[in-house]
Amino acid sequence: MVLYGDVHDAYVETFRGRTLVNVGSVGNPLDETTASYVILEGVGETFSLQIVRVPYDVEAEIAVAESVGMPELEAYAIELRTAIYRGQHAELGLSARE
């Protein structure tokens, strides 16, 4: 089993006989606008795995980011509100005013 993060998209899949688990993102998810984490329980080869989703106050996070002068705030705000990666905003016609 391989567990990893940094992709911001929670999922479980099998690849070449191995279980791959991406835990998603607590602060900047890009698959849903809810935060996610993984619970893994078990011993040896017997285990259970659960992706857990929790509510995330996106507007509060955006307010904090604005208060500390976060660079590229507009792109970050769109990303948090839509769960769409900032590199896709232009081609989708997204702006913070929508």
Where are each of the predicted segments found?
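Acidic, His/Gly-rich catalytic cores of divalent-metal-dependent hydrolytic chemistry
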Residues: 14-98
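Active-site neighborhood of phospho(di)ester-bond hydrolases with catalytic His/Asp-centered motifs
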Residues: 1-6, 20-24
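Short active-site segment of divalent metal-dependent hydrolases/proteases
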Residues: 9
